[in-house]
Amino acid sequence: MIEKAIIPVILSGGSGTRLWPLSRESYPKQFLSLDSHSKKTLLQKTYERLIGLEGLENPILICNEDHRFIVAEQFREINTDPQAIILEPVGRNTAPAIAVAALKAINLGKDPLLLILAADHLIENIIEFKKVIQSATTYANQGRLVTFGIIPTCAETGYGYIEAK
């Protein structure tokens, strides 16, 4: 079986309201460095933690129109040329962003595996993270849809849990 390339799709369309006063609508948390040991931002770390994965290609980035120059500059700083920066005129959440990224990959003449990533996640165990991705690619190369995440420690309505009253 031919192994497909992996194109990371990095979603960085957050509004910057959850980490106020550090982040703002004009400069959401994904564009901040929250690590005292590194000047890299959450967005930059999202891509850099993937380096070394077999079949990795440069990313497709999705962001708010207002953040396009921030995104481009942050990738210039890490010497990475995105395949595309897709601008959202209005945030419509995850599913439409993923659909547009898939269409962009097709328009680039590719049939890759898309690795959908949020730009604002903190992932400490990068070695284990890469192992999980490599394992997932085995199934995805067989035509399966693969999702992964963490076991939640509590219910949070901001992540889709329904609060009964």
Locate the predicted segments by residue:
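Basic, gly/Ser/Thr/Pro-rich low-complexity segments located predominantly at protein N termini
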Residues: 18-21, 163-165
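Short acidic donor-binding/metal-coordinating loop in glycosyltransferase active sites
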Residues: 119
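Conserved core of the sugar-phosphate nucleotidyltransferase
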Residues: 126-165
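Conserved N-terminal catalytic core of the sugar/cofactor nucleotidyltransferase
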Residues: 1-10, 19-25, 33-116, 124-127
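Short glycine- and Lys/Arg-enriched binding-loop motifs that mark or flank ligand-binding interfaces
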Residues: 9-12, 154-156
